[in-house]
C-alpha cells in the first residue's frame, strides 16, 4: 500500500493538491529535467493523484521538491489530469497558502522555483498572495482561424507561463450558466488551431483558450472564460491567463505600467493584476486568495483496478 500526503486548497474556486510526501525520487538535475523524468517514468503517479477516483478534471497537482535555486523556498512541478504545466498561477497561490499553513513560511517576500523559472511571491498578513510571474509576452497579434460552426475567430497568441489563444469573440454571455456552450466553443477553437498548425513560439502547443470580455456586474472589471488542457474550464480567473492578457493589453497600449487590472473568472471571483516592463514583454504581478480545504493521505492499493486513476 502506497501512501501520499497531500493538502488540498482552492484559489478563487479552482483546486490545488500539494504533494508533501510519498512520491518517488526524481533524481538530480534542474526542475525541467525532473519534470521530464516525472513524465517518462512516473506518469501513473500523476494520474493517481489528479484523475478520478481521487481527483477530477479540474484538479491541479503541485509536487514540492527541494529547490535548485538557493534563493527559493521550494521547488514545484505542476500537473493535471492530462499532463504537465510549466507554471500555474492559481496553483502557486495555493502552494504559498499551504506553506503558510505548514509554518514553513511567514508573511513577507519569498521565491518559488518552477520548471520555467523562479517566481517571486509575497504573502500579506491578511492572507493575500501576490505572484511576480515569469516574463510574459504576446507572440502574435490578430491571428485568424476558421472554426467549424463559428466562422473566422480572431485572437492573440500569448505566453503567460503557458500558451494561450485569447479572443474577445464570445458566442454567449460569460456566465456559469453558459459554461457548456463556452466549453464547446473554446474546444472547437483549440481543435481548429491544431488543424491549422498554429502554435506558440518554437512550436509550443496552445493548450489554453481564453475568452475575454467585460464583467456583467457593472464593476468595470474584466471577465474571462478559460479552457484548460484537460478540457475543463478554469473556475478561477487563471493566473497565467491573466498574465498573458496583461501582456496583450500592454502591447496594445491599453494598460499602463503599474495600472491595476481586475480580472474576474467565470464564477465572479477575481484576481488583481498589474505589470512592469521587462525584456521582450512584461513582468506581471497577480494577487488573490486561497483557502485550505483538506489534509489527507491518498492510499494506493495494488489490488485496486483504479489504483493509478481512471484514464481515458
Swiss-Prot record:
Listed SUPFAM superfamilies: Diaminopimelate epimerase-like
Residue numbers annotated as active site:
88, 238
The reaction(s) catalysed by this protein are: trans-4-hydroxy-L-proline = cis-4-hydroxy-D-proline
Q: Does the keyword Isomerase apply?
A: yes
Q: Where does substrate bind?
A: 89-90, 208, 234, 239-240
One molecular function GO term is: 4-hydroxyproline epimerase activity
Assigned EC number: 5.1.1.8
Keywords on record: Isomerase
Annotated family = Belongs to the proline racemase family.
What is the role of this chain? Catalyzes the epimerization of trans-4-hydroxy-L-proline (t4LHyp) to cis-4-hydroxy-D-proline (c4DHyp). Is likely involved in a degradation pathway that converts t4LHyp to alpha-ketoglutarate. Can also catalyze the epimerization of trans-3-hydroxy-L-proline (t3LHyp) to cis-3-hydroxy-D-proline (c3DHyp), albeit with 500-fold lower efficiency. Displays no proline racemase activity.
Name this protein carries in UniProt:
4-hydroxyproline 2-epimerase
Q: Which organism is it from?
A: Xanthomonas campestris pv. campestris (strain ATCC 33913 / DSM 3586 / NCPPB 528 / LMG 568 / P 25)
Amino acid at each position: 500500500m502506497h501512501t501520499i500526503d497531500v493538502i488540498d486548497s482552492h484559489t478563487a474556486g479552482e483546486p490545488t493538491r500539494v504533494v508533501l510526501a510519498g512520491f518517488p525520487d526524481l533524481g538530480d538535475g534542474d526542475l525541467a529535467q525532473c519534470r521530464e523524468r516525472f513524465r517518462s517514468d512516473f506518469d501513473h503517479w500523476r494520474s493517481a493523484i489528479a484523475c478520478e477516483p481521487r481527483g477530477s478534471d479540474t484538479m491541479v497537482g503541485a509536487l514540492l521538491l527541494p529547490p535548485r535555486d538557493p534563493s527559493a523556498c521550494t521547488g514545484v512541478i505542476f500537473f493535471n489530469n492530462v499532463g504537465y504545466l510549466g507554471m500555474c498561477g492559481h496553483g502557486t497561490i495555493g502552494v504559498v497558502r499551504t506553506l503558510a499553513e505548514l509554518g514553513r513560511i511567514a508573511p513577507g517576500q519569498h521565491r518559488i522555483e518552477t520548471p520555467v523559472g523562479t517566481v517571486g511571491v509575497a504573502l500579506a498578513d491578511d492572507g493575500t498572495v501576490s505572484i511576480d510571474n515569469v516574463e510574459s509576452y504576446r507572440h502574435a497579434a490578430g491571428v485568424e482561424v476558421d472554426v467549424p460552426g463559428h466562422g473566422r475567430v480572431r485572437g492573440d497568441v500569448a505566453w503567460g507561463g503557458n500558451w494561450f489563444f485569447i479572443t474577445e469573440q464570445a458566442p454567449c454571455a460569460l456566465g456559469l450558466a453558459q459554461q457548456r456552450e463556452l466549453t464547446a466553443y473554446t474546444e472547437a477553437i483549440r481543435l481548429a488551431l491544431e488543424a491549422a498548425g498554429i502554435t506558440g513560439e518554437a512550436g509550443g502547443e496552445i493548450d489554453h483558450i481564453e475568452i475575454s470580455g467585460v464583467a456583467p456586474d457593472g464593476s468595470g472589471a474584466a471577465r474571462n472564460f478559460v479552457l484548460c488542457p484537460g478540457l475543463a474550464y478554469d473556475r478561477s480567473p487563471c493566473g497565467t491567463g491573466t498574465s498573458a492578457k496583461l501582456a496583450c493589453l500592454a502591447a496594445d497600449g491599453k494598460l499602463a505600467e503599474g495600472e491595476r487590472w481586475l480580472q474576474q473568472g467565470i464564477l465572479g471571483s477575481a484576481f488583481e493584476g498589474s505589470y512592469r516592463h521587462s525584456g521582450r514583454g512584461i513582468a506581471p504581478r497577480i494577487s488573490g486568495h486561497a483557502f485550505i480545504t483538506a489534509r489527507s493521505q491518498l492510499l494506493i492499493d495494488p489490488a485496486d483496478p483504479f489504483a493509478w486513476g481512471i484514464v481515458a
